[in-house]
Amino acid sequence: MIRLENVSVDFPAGKDAQSRAVNNVNLTIQQGEVFGIVGTSGAGKSTLLRTINLLQRPTEGRVFLGDTLISDASGRELRQHRQRIGMIFQHFNLMHTRNVYDNVAFSLRAAGKSKEEIASRVPEILALVGLQDKEASYPAQLSGGQKQRVGIARAIANHPEVLLCDEPTSALDLETSASILALLKSINVRLGITIVLISHEMSVIKSICQRMAVMTGGNIVEEGEVFTIFSAPQHAYTKQLVSHTTPIELPERFKQNNKGVLLKILFADDSVEQPILSDVAQRFQVSVNILHGNIEYINDRALGHIIAQISYRDDPAAENLAAAITYIRQNTFGVEVIND
């Protein structure tokens, strides 16, 4: 378990001035989970991540790894704590004059492992990340995805309890990003390593994390299960991020020229599998026209967004229309009228 208590980080900002990058953060990350921190550039997420392994010392506050206070550690004690925490970076940070084998072996040598232990561990860990045939290759001969796999192998070579991931896919294309995220998820499941991942992309957080925090201006403004935050964001900034990830909007002309009521409907879990809109059409004698929609799965839970037009049939009856909307509201996760 990782626990941050009242952690703040200040940087010099001119003569006798300080700029606060992280402001009074309290955060608990459970053992074995994949936890995401999302925010735009300058939000403070990289600085916060680096306080966990003390690459960045907190100006204020305390950092715990398990029950151990590590933020006051230094020297040999700090090095011992850092061996419990691996880290991968946006731009890989490989040694270009050493081949793949030696890049991974470097972290083992630094930890004092014997030649025999290194000779046994390096092939094992390269096989885990799918690079068993690249031992003799140099970074210049590798693709971006392969370089990140070397970074992952190096980071987990010493059996860490925690893996910190600093924008691990931002330098990669979509297909390669997906393969790296799948690898991280597999490592989490197979090895039980706690993963803390930061990204400016909500889609990355959504694809791999169980819980998440939203960060802006050095502050965590929202925290919770990924599904809950995507289905019912509370903070205005979080709502903005979610809307960019799942854009469910119609051209303005549809709203202006539409003869019925336009509803933005949120389906979740079991309601996704129910014929709710079909039931509405039959029960209340209204016409239902689906204009836009999608369904996705977050941590094996269904989340759907639909924009539907509800209108009268041959015999207009306002009470039928109102009753239909009420029925939808009662049987889904949320309804918003968007053409009042």
UniProtKB/Swiss-Prot annotation:
Entry-linked CDD domains: ABC_MetN_methionine_transporter
Function field: Part of the ABC transporter complex MetNIQ involved in methionine import. Responsible for energy coupling to the transport system.
SMART domains: AAA, NIL
Membrane association type: Peripheral membrane protein
Stated name of the protein: Methionine import ATP-binding protein MetN 1
UniProt-annotated binding residues for ATP: G39, T40, S41, G42, A43, G44, K45, S46
Provenance organism: Pectobacterium atrosepticum (strain SCRI 1043 / ATCC BAA-672) (Erwinia carotovora subsp. atroseptica)
Protein keywords: Amino-acid transport, ATP-binding, Cell inner membrane, Cell membrane, Membrane, Nucleotide-binding, Translocase, Transport
Underlying gene: metN1
